A protein has these predicted regions:
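Accessory terminal regions of nucleic-acid processing enzymes
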Residues: 20, 27, 45-48, 56-57, ...
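Metal-dependent nuclease catalytic regions and adjoining charged, substrate-binding loops involved
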Residues: 1, 5-6, 146-221
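Metal-dependent nuclease catalytic cores that hydrolyze phosphodiester bonds in DNA/RNA
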Residues: 1-109, 113
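Short small-residue beta-strand/loop micro-motif enriched in glycine and branched aliphatics
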Residues: 32-34, 124-127
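Short acidic (Asp/Glu) and glycine-rich catalytic loops that position anionic groups and cofactors
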Residues: 26-32, 120, 168-172
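Short, solvent-exposed loop/turn segments at secondary-structure boundaries
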Residues: 128-132
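Active-site ExK catalytic segment of metal-dependent nucleases
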Residues: 103-109, 115-124, 137
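An active-site-proximal "capping" alpha-helix that borders the catalytic cofactor pocket
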Residues: 134-146
Length: 221
């Protein structure tokens, strides 16, 4: 039986469309590539540098002042460098040989427990359900940490940045929203289980909302 290499982003395709997920892993048929905006990647880089400067000073950044006295920034720089890497990240392999890895943005530490912190850049203020789109990703990160022997809290944080205004000197100001969400390890386990089951079965039906499958069906007439 073939084994597979998963990541939170590749597993998100399972929810979007089981057929596209099956084709991607079993037939190496991928969605057409599109231009990826560079701004989120640039923001991610400068935010990590910003947080690392605060970590070296042993202080929390202004965006996390509401957590003062409760947590500190994870300060194992070498380990954090590995866990942030898209080529390494936090890894785990199941007994069948299926491999999953994920690259985190940052970690907070509360006593002996870790708390995953992820940065998100948006163009607009949050909606009521914005954080729900990232629950699977955060559950998988926590699952991986626990599989590697680290205790994590039963919650995680998303730190959202969205543009607010441009000052007279040209500096762009961002508002921030810190959102605390509950961790569900069982959800991560179920995602992995379903992923393997789908890939080991026949090609599934496409999602009704999948624009790629709709496009293909129209091409085929």
């Amino acid at each position: 039986m073939p084994t597979h290499k998963f990541s939170p982003s590749s597993l998100s395709l399972l929810k979007d469309c089981p057929r596209c997920f099956w084709l991607y892993f079993n037939k190496n048929i991928k969605h057409p590539t599109t231009a990826f905006p560079s701004l989120p990647s640039g923001m991610d880089k400068v935010l990590k540098e910003h947080f690392d400067r605060c970590m070296k000073k042993r202080e929390l950044p202004p965006e996390l002042t509401q957590l003062n006295g409760e947590v500190k920034l994870f300060d194992n720089e070498e380990l954090l460098k590995v866990w942030r890497s898209n080529f390494k990240g936090i890894q785990w392999t199941d007994k069948s040989g299926n491999h999953i890895h994920g690259a985190i943005d940052n970690l907070l530490q509360k006593g002996k427990k870790l708390i995953v912190l992820d940065y998100k850049t948006r163009g607009f203020p949050l909606k009521e359900d914005t954080h729900e789109h990232y629950k699977d990703q955060m559950d998988i990160y926590n699952f991986l940490l626990r599989k590697n022997g680290y205790d994590t809290e039963d919650y995680t944080y998303l730190l959202f940045y969205h543009p607010h205004r441009v000052e007279e000197n040209g500096h762009v100001c961002f508002n921030t929203d810190l959102v605390k969400i509950k961790v569900n390890i069982t959800n991560a386990e179920n995602i992995l289980k379903k992923a393997v089951e789908v890939l080991e079965g026949d090609m599934p039906h496409s999602s009704k909302e999948c624009g790629f499958c709709e496009w293909k069906s129209k091409l085929n007439g």
